Amino acid sequence: MIPDVSQALAWLEKHPQALKGIQRGLERETLRVNADGSLATTGHPESLGSALTHKWITTDFAEALLEFITPVDGDIDHMLTLMRDVHRYTARQLGDERMWPLSMPCYIEQGQDIELAQYGTSNIGRLKTLYREGLKNRYGALMQTISGVHYNFSLPMAFWQAKCGETDKEAISAGYFRLIRNYYRFGWVIPYLFGASPAICSSFLQGKPTTLPFEKTDCGMYYLPYATSLRLSDLGYTNKSQSNLGITFNDLHEYVAGLKRAIKTPSEEYETIGLEKDGKRLQINSNVLQIENELYAPIRPKRVTRSGEAPSDALERGGIEYIEVRSLDINPFSPIGVDEQQIRFLDLFMVWCVLADAPEMSSDELLCTRTNWNRVILEGRKPGLTLGIGCETAQFPLAKVGKDLFRDLKRVAQTMDSLYGGEEYQKVCDQLVESFDNPELTFSARILRSMIDQGIGGTGRTLAAQYRDMLQQEPLEVLSEEDFVAEREASIARQREVEAGDTESFEAFLAKHA
């Protein structure tokens, strides 16, 4: 089931320097909650500066949904330490509030008014809030409070020069699309190993019927005994109306055209919401996607955008610059929601995905890959579970496929370790491969044991309090208090500048973006 990568691995072993200069970045979302686990109803703390323009600390869907961002970094340890510093500083600014350590929210009641993230009075700030209003009206606010971690990854120019003999945008984009196709085919390994949302609070179902065979604890927790990541399931944030958009990952121009088409495709379902009610705007437009970011995807091709530029225009201009992996649940065993082992695994898996042969993929096959993901998401730890290839009928044991994959990853790890020194990458392979023979070692199995014992609420509250105390007590390491104060002031000044620079009404601005 695994493609033959022996030739590509032999090439890599001869060209280890091609991997020198891998760049990464992290984004972590987390809800601000009170000591009892309920959602904080306070505004974004003033001491954290402007959520519109701060370079490390912003908000996602809700005013209480923090998002922490690291700059692009070539050093894993430095990136994780900076992320920890952002958590340490924030923990000291939150008073008695703390950061929810799980992907799935718990203490949010049906119909509770969740305040949307606010970004000030500028046109762009108001558009961001209106986009969130649209998300709320389309999918419900609760779905939008699910948190995750995003891992951004790029290969150095030296890799593309050595592998393709050229570094033009077409060659590099083709290489990243190969990575993406392999990710769709084999990325289910990420929720298998690191999925950490095998259960939900009953409030999350909002009284709606479900076809999933949930088991229920006395405290009202719903769980699937072999599930890995309900965050990635249809219970989480997936958009069924997007499944037939026909967006594919074979060619840059084809992908961009598909994305632009989706933005302009009207949706009967969303037309029924309307654009305005009682003078209040309800969504940017009634198309399948209000803006490109609404496209649900476990992985995205990206390029840093210029001011006012749409993501697809940036891709068309310069090709793919980096990849955003979006399938990581919050790691509940880390105060910062992610750890070094995960980053090293993702490095290895990304390199494998770009090396392994990846035939072009029709939109039909793309839908078929969802079958494997769903199996792993809902019953990944089930003994004897099998997976298929694309739309074919042949089935293969997950445990065997996983071990075959890790045989390849071990060779990539040896190359990475020879380049960077030490044996850290190989150690990660040795630790994680055991999870295929013993699923109890996976994140989902470990956290489910705690949840069955304490409930989701109890587990979340205990970890939130523990991490709050830990982070508040730890000294800052790579950033200083002065850095945070300076960035707070600078971000507020940047927001004021944006607001002062607006030259047109919001209506005129919106007309250009709708």
Curated annotation (Swiss-Prot):
Q: Which domain of life is it from?
A: Bacteria
Name its pathway. Answer: Sulfur metabolism; glutathione biosynthesis; glutathione from L-cysteine and L-glutamate: step 1/2
The UniProt record lists the EC number as 6.3.2.2
- GO terms under biological process: glutathione biosynthetic process
The record's SUPFAM superfamilies line, in alphabetical order, gives: Glutamine synthetase/guanido kinase (SSF55931)
The UniProt GO MF terms for this protein read: ATP binding; glutamate-cysteine ligase activity; metal ion binding
Q: Name one GO cellular component term.
A: cytosol
- Catalytic activity reported: L-cysteine + L-glutamate + ATP = gamma-L-glutamyl-L-cysteine + ADP + phosphate + H(+)
Q: Which family does it belong to?
A: Belongs to the glutamate--cysteine ligase type 1 family. Type 1 subfamily.
This chain's protein is named Glutamate--cysteine ligase
Organism of origin: Enterobacter sp. (strain 638)
What taxonomic classification does the UniProt entry list for its organism?
Bacteria, Pseudomonadati, Pseudomonadota, Gammaproteobacteria, Enterobacterales
Chain's gene name: gshA
